Amino acid sequence: MEEVKQSRGVRDTSIALYKRHLNKLAMDITGKEYENEKFLKTKADEIIKYLDDKSNSVRRNFSASIMVALSPKQKNSPTDEYRGVYERYAKLLTEGQAKYLESKKDNKMNSKEEKNWISFNEVISLRDNLSKKLKKEGVKMTSTDISKSNFDLLQQYLVLSLYTLLPPRRNEYATMKIINKKEYLDLDESELKKNNYLINLSKTNKMFSYGSEKVKSKIEGGNNTINVPKELNSVLNLWLHFNKSDNLLVTQQGGMGMTKNQLTLLLNRIFKPKMISTSMLRKIYLTNIFGDEAERNNKKEKIAEQMNHSVSVAENIYIKDV
């Protein structure tokens, strides 16, 4: 996989995902960890049979990881030894992609989405109720301390604000670091690519920097920056008044940073008994924001950039008929 990283410029997160897929295949089929591409050739029949039992999206993702391993330097360039088996996996990927897009084309919810779906207005209402609770508890900028329960409430309020006062992104906020202007200007290109930052320029001015290696979709130029809107800036000021760590989101009042999985668990707790993740919030947001066809065409390109996905993904995957 080191060759893949050097030759293709693939992000570390993608490399880790490829490794997980290949190791799972090897463990499930041979009981041993993945060693090299010979396994993908000698066990091709078993691998394809194994993937035939999986969902379209799983089959598609595993096929992509296999093809990267068989053609590490660039796409569609395996050695002659692996050309035949590469084409078999390429066919599997193409068929999986076609079935996946076909299943999403009518924008109908699946059973899981139907069970957990709420409107965007309900998300807003929940956020506003948290704000009222905090005010009732006397949590404000002039407070000198905060209880553990109110600290948790405040973080819940922050999370819902992050995903409603800006077009909702994926789980990038989980590992985001807080830095000041000087620290930001001192960062080199590698650090900007590898990390996500909240840059605290002043009480009235902040921005987010999303690194190209920390997000799913490709970002040109290494990182993407977005100015924090006024209402979200006020929420952040209140949060930073009590959160003295350099982590935007924390697992406890002591300041330990979150993982992406922990952010998902926090969202599940906020929306309980509904199981709502960042992916579901993105679908809810886009379904709400795009009205008639004219309005949809005017908005979708700008929204897609802010949410870090393509317009086609917004149309085919995220926007749901309700």
Residue ranges and their predicted role:
Residues 176-230:
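Conserved tyrosine-mediated DNA breakage-rejoining catalytic core shared by Y-recombinases
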Residues 174, 276, 283-286, 293-308:
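Active-site-proximal segment of tyrosine recombinases
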Residues 221-285, 290:
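Active-site/catalytic core of tyrosine-dependent DNA strand-transfer enzymes
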Residues 123-171:
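Basic, Lys/Arg- and aromatic-enriched nucleic-acid-binding interface segment
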Residues 5-93, 279, 283:
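Non-catalytic DNA-binding core/recognition domains of DNA-processing enzymes
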Residues 79-140:
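Flexible interdomain linker/hinge and immediately adjacent N-terminus
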Residues 291-294, 305-322:
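Catalytic-site neighborhood detector that most strongly recognizes the C-terminal catalytic loop/helix
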